[in-house]
Structure formats: structure tokens, C-alpha cells
Curated annotation (Swiss-Prot):
Disulfide bonds: 29-75, 39-58, 44-69, 48-71
Highest taxon of source: Eukaryota
Subcellular localization, as worded in the UniProt entry: Secreted
Record's protein name: Putative defensin-like protein 118
Parts forming coiled coils: none
Gene, per the UniProt record: LCR52
Gene Ontology BP annotations: defense response to fungus; killing of cells of another organism
Signal peptide coordinates: 1-25
Gene Ontology cellular-component terms listed: extracellular region
Pfam families to which the protein is assigned, alphabetical: SLR1-BP
Amino acid sequence: MSKSTILAIFMIVLVLGKVTKETQGQEMCRDILMKAKNCDEGTCDTLCKQKWKGNGSCFPNVYTYRKSCLCTFPCKT
């Protein structure tokens, strides 16, 4: 193989390795807020933005028989 072919293969492997590393931090994490209180959509979304810089939505929590706030946000690497 010529030097240019080997260099091209090396560069492709290097670029693919960088792209793979960058996309690993894109995973989403979750946290449940307002377990003791009944969830309000506006309050839930505001709390999530303040605490995690994420989005919040209410869901029926079968363990507390109330609506809880589910906060979804990008995981930190």
C-alpha cells in the first residue's frame, strides 16, 4: 500500500473515534421530583429547568397514588 492510502485509513479511524466519543454524552437521565405533593405541569417544568436544565412533565405515580414530576435532562459525562 502507498503512504497516502495508509494515511487516509488512519485519518478515517481517527475521525470515527472522535465522533463516537462525542455522541456518548448524549444519553438522557431522569429524576422524579415532587413525590410528596400532587404535580402541577408549570411548577414541574420550572423545577426541572432550574435543577437540571431539562424538561418536566407530570405522570401518575402508582406508589404514591398522586401525580409526580418526571424530569428528563442530558446526562453529564
